[in-house]
Every structure is written in structure tokens, then in C-alpha cells.
């Protein structure tokens, strides 16, 4: 099953997440099909905290991909901001 989920990157105590489309059987930070955005929960000031390609997310959801709980909230926030 294809899932849209977060893949953690960054240093210790400085998380940075890529929003990826991946097969649910692969490791969380392993192989992915497509990168559709990023999320920086520690963004301050003028730094960009969230970038999401909503067209590609909607494409994958239309193809039957499931969305993780956290990514669903981020998509909702991005749609509200757009």
C-alpha cells in the first residue's frame, strides 16, 4: 500500500522532515517514490516551515494512497493557507 508520510532527517534535537510518497513496507527513512514537500517544526522568523506540492498530494490520494495522521493535518493547514 502506498502511503504519504514523514521521513525524519536533520541532526539530534533538530528534526527536519521530508514529506514523501512511499510503499508502506519500506523503512520510514528508506526508499520512497516521490518527495512532495518538507516540514520544519523548528522554523523561526522568516524561515519557511512548510512547503507542500498540493497538486501531487491530490494526485496520489486519487491513485489510492493513504495519508498519515500528521501529514493529513499538514495538508489541511497548507490548504487553509493557500
UniProtKB/Swiss-Prot annotation:
A cellular component annotation (GO) from this entry: small ribosomal subunit
Keyword Signal: no
Metal-binding keyword on record: no
PROSITE patterns: RIBOSOMAL_S16
Alphabetic keyword roster: Ribonucleoprotein, Ribosomal protein
Similarity annotation: Belongs to the bacterial ribosomal protein bS16 family.
Annotated protein name in UniProt: Small ribosomal subunit protein bS16
Origin species: Vibrio parahaemolyticus serotype O3:K6 (strain RIMD 2210633)
Organism placement in taxonomy: Bacteria, Pseudomonadati, Pseudomonadota, Gammaproteobacteria, Vibrionales
Gene name tied to this protein: rpsP
